[in-house]
Amino acid sequence: GGISLVNDPAASTYEALQTREAGARVIMIDPNIRLGFIAGVEDSYRARITRMIARADIVKLSDEDLHWFAGAGDLHALAQGILDMGPKVVFLTEGAKGAHAITKTLARFAPARSVTVADTVGAGDTFNAGALAALHNRGALSKAGIAQLDAGSLDAALALGVQAAAITVSRAGANPPWAHELGA
């Protein structure tokens, strides 16, 4: 997501890959919007992100990303608007507050872990890795699995995502945890 989806040829290549694989593979997108990189191309960037969200199964957005994309309002209502575009689950991170997993029928939350923050670079990517690993561990990382996520799977995804992100932000240099640090 983010920077790689701003300029061609990378942006159109990633979008073409997503289009080609969307029917056969679980697709996750984390737009990771960086305003400094989209200045002057905001309309085309928003259009590309809109198309890619519509083809994704899983969308991860920070609260700031969601407000940029969908406007002001209640986060859960805005996330439901994202789900109306096609994805099956929205992971919504709120930094030190924690993270949400939202589907058409479920809304789950995991509070952030209290840590001394050294560096926030990589927190979102590490959350994504933890959430995806948890879904994989539960046998839910398939088109069918994502379409019928239950509370236990969402809770597991949030728990591992939040745990992994907490470890990452507690040390400098976007240094994600090893499996043994997560009890995995």
Name each region found by the language model.
Residues 19-20, 71-184:
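Conserved phosphate-binding/catalytic region of the ribokinase-like
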